[in-house]
Amino acid sequence: MGFVLPASFPGASSITTGGSCLRSKQYAKNYYASSYVTTLWHKKGKIQKEYCAVIFSRHNLKQHYKVNEGGSTSKECEKKYVVNAISEQSFEYEPQARDPKNIWGSVNDALDTFYKFCRPYAIFSVVLGATFKSLVAVERLSDLSLAFFIGWLQVVVAVICIHIFDVGLNQLCDIEIDKINKPDLPLASGNLSFRNVVIITASSLILGLGFAWIVGSWPLFWTVFICCMFAAAYNVDLPLLRWKKYPVLTAISFIANVAVTRSLGFFLHMQTCVFKRPTTFPRPLIFCTAIVSIYAIVIALFKDIPDMEGDEKFGIQSLSLRLGPKRVFWICVSLLEMAYGVTILVGATSPILWSKIITVLGHAILASVLWYHAKSTDLTSNVVLQSFYMFIWKLHTAEYCLIPLFR
């Protein structure tokens, strides 16, 4: 007994089972996908499936198919696949199910792309910074309550939204530059489309402002708004904007955004909205703003050293292009060493013994480690300079750990 599954060709076919012969008419039409004829014979529990796959071009092809009971021939068939299968139960066609491993692989790739898009070295630092800036408002151990934890989570959500908006807008405005300086970024490499990055960036802004509004914290709302406006002024290429072209405006943008706005905003959110205390500006807050301002200047200047090639091509006159990478490198190192020296002197005046010891000893260690790395850095290697830039971010993170301990 013969079982025949007709192929999905447009037109009629004459099928003869008694004579063990199937003849198909000639077709002279344009096809843009491969078609196949499947003939199944059931004999002693065995199924023989024969596929004749035809790749049709945009030219007219005449194809003749002749399918016999014992075999299959094709006069003008470019590819032929024969599959022998043995089955004793069912001869019905069953669609292939999706491989869960492939689905998980796609999800994993998407998460990895988003992870790279967010620049993990920076997002870790900003979240840690927001955490320790929130701790500045803690006056006693009893302040570390559930209310503090909820307020801290609110700050973390806000700062992540700010960060994603910042990096997203930067990549949107610097696509061509990043293809030279940072070709591994998702947008520059093509792993993320321009449209998707626009959606992610706009969503982070809306989510940040909406979240702060729902929480009912005006310090948090204005922190998100002002930080995003500084990010736009720094990146967007419009009249009076695109501050990254000018070293002084770049430094001002980083100080105002990272040091002043975030330090004050997160502290006031915890102080007034979480702890319900009057607005004050304690000594740790002033120290936090001052030391983070130095780091903001150093990061703003140093980040352009590995990016000189792309900046020069697109007319961005960074300080590294004006003074040279070596001079800017040692300016950044000197600024950090001076900041550590001043911090050691100020920390020594603390009336609290444990705060005095931690502040002096901690910054002395940071200063020593920085000097050791600076002396062994090859200033002619762009890879080494990029590595040193990552090292500055690590120092920045370590500084955040010391800030709440300054009293």
From Swiss-Prot:
Name this polypeptide is given: Naringenin 8-dimethylallyltransferase 2, chloroplastic
Chain segment of the transit peptide: 1-23
Keyword Transit peptide among record annotations: yes
TM ranges: 117-137, 145-165, 206-226, 248-268, 285-305, 328-348, 352-372, 383-403
Cofactor(s) it depends on: Mg(2+); Mn(2+)
Gene from which the chain derives: N8DT-2
Enzyme Commission number, as recorded: 2.5.1.70
Top-level EC class as recorded in UniProt: transferase
One Gene Ontology cellular component: chloroplast
Family: Belongs to the UbiA prenyltransferase family.
Gene3D superfamilies to which the protein is assigned, alphabetical: UbiA prenyltransferase
Superkingdom of origin organism: Eukaryota
Cited InterPro entries: AtHST-like, UbiA_prenyltransferase, UbiA_sf
Catalysis performed (reactions): (2S)-naringenin + dimethylallyl diphosphate = sophoraflavanone B + diphosphate
Keywords, in A-Z order: Chloroplast, Membrane, Plastid, Transferase, Transit peptide, Transmembrane, Transmembrane helix
Functional description taken from the UniProt entry: Involved in the biosynthesis of sophoraflavanone G (SFG). Can use flavanones (naringenin, liquiritigenin and hesperetin) as substrates, but not flavonols or isoflavones. Shows a strict specificity for dimethylallyl diphosphate.
Topology of the protein relative to the lipid bilayer: Multi-pass membrane protein
Lineage: Eukaryota, Viridiplantae, Streptophyta, Embryophyta, Tracheophyta
Keyword Cytoplasm among record annotations: no
Compartments reported by the entry: Plastid, Chloroplast membrane
Pfam families: UbiA
GO MF assignments: prenyltransferase activity
